[in-house]
Amino acid sequence: METEGWPALQPLLCLAWIATTLPIIVAALPIPAAAGGHLLRRLLSAFSSRGKTVRPSPASSSGSSSSKAKFTVPQKYFMHFYVVGVLATTILLLAIWFYAYMKMTPLLPESSSYSTIASHLVGSNSFSFGRVHSRTMGHKYHVWRTVFVLLLMEIQVLRRLYETEHVFHYSPSARMHIVGYLTGLFYYVAAPLSLASSCIPEAAEYLQGQVAEFIVKGRARMPDLVIDSSSLLQPLLKLGWTQWIGAVIFIWGSLHQIRCHAILGTLREHKDSDEYVIPCGDWFNRVSCPHYLAELVIYFGMLVASGGEDIPVWFLFVFVITNLSFAAVETHKWYLQKFEDYPRSRYAIIPFVC
């Protein structure tokens, strides 16, 4: 449902995802060096590097190291991603949840069955009533489904914010490229926008109307707002099986990511140490970057829970796959170069694929 002032939101999001995904796909293709393939891969590798993969080697000159440092930021700035993600997701979640509560409840009105019977008794308008009723109910489900998916996203960014502060111990020398940093900030704004893109226009219009009414009438003339907790939560429990399958996939991926992050967090007991060891346990026994694999599972769960009806959600998922796969391959190469005894049976991110 498009609303004046917001008609281009979904196309803009799709274009933004294409612009960020396409260079990664092109860099992964076997383009000859003469055609610029090697240069593009080196640029993308530099932009996506962080932590151990961005640290200059001891053999590099001090001038080269200082030059590289100009285009990097501390890896502990990862926290900025999740602060931005929490803010963006929370604002959208509260706005759309409020809109759904005020305009999209009850999800299944008790009178609907009686109205349908009456329409059949009347006869002439039964089919048109059924079509309108079906569209209305379908739209209500869509809005509440968006609330459900935003709740999953909120859980994800809140957990990642906690882990960044309390689980990971970034080395003082760990850096990430400024382009990767800006891409991360973009991602944690665009991701919740994509998950809610189809509902944002109407929710924004409703909230604007409420604010305008408040300004004109004043608080004394506005009706009292009474929040019924059952009406706030009950529609979420009446969503379809697709949402709950998506939630189960999301939880499965989250549990494995929690374990893998805990393993990574304990590799360096001393925060000032730069020493790296081979991680083992959980999905690390299969792939080099199981926390990335878990991220793919998490966002696949969100895609399933969303119903897959909105194109920006698909573009978001494609970006997650390409971005994390590219980064995982670079990390896998680093492990193989760093450790002579690194298990050759491990894949980069997806078992039996890459």
UniProtKB/Swiss-Prot annotation:
Domain of life: Eukaryota
The reaction(s) this protein catalyses: a di-trans,poly-cis-dolichal + NADP(+) = a di-trans,poly-cis-polyprenal + NADPH + H(+)
EC number(s) per entry: 1.3.1.94
Keyword line: Cell membrane, Membrane, NADP, Oxidoreductase, Transmembrane, Transmembrane helix
Record keyword Cell wall biogenesis/degradation present: no
One MF annotation (Gene Ontology) recorded for this entry: 3-oxo-5-alpha-steroid 4-dehydrogenase activity
Recorded GO CC terms: endoplasmic reticulum; plasma membrane
Top-tier EC class: oxidoreductase
Compartmental location: Cell membrane
Pathway annotation from the record: Protein modification; protein glycosylation
The keyword Transmembrane helix belongs to this UniProt entry's keyword annotation: yes
GO biological process terms held by the UniProt record: dolichol biosynthetic process; dolichol-linked oligosaccharide biosynthetic process; polyprenol catabolic process
Topological type in the membrane: Multi-pass membrane protein
Sequence intervals crossing the membrane: 11-31, 78-98, 141-158, 176-196, 235-255, 301-321
A Pfam family this chain is assigned to: Steroid_dh
Main location: membrane
Family: Belongs to the steroid 5-alpha reductase family. Polyprenal reductase subfamily.
Known role: Plays a key role in early steps of protein N-linked glycosylation by being involved in the conversion of polyprenol into dolichol. Acts as a polyprenal reductase that mediates the reduction of polyprenal into dolichal in a NADP-dependent mechanism. Dolichols are required for the synthesis of dolichol-linked monosaccharides and the oligosaccharide precursor used for N-glycosylation.
Protein name: Polyprenal reductase 1
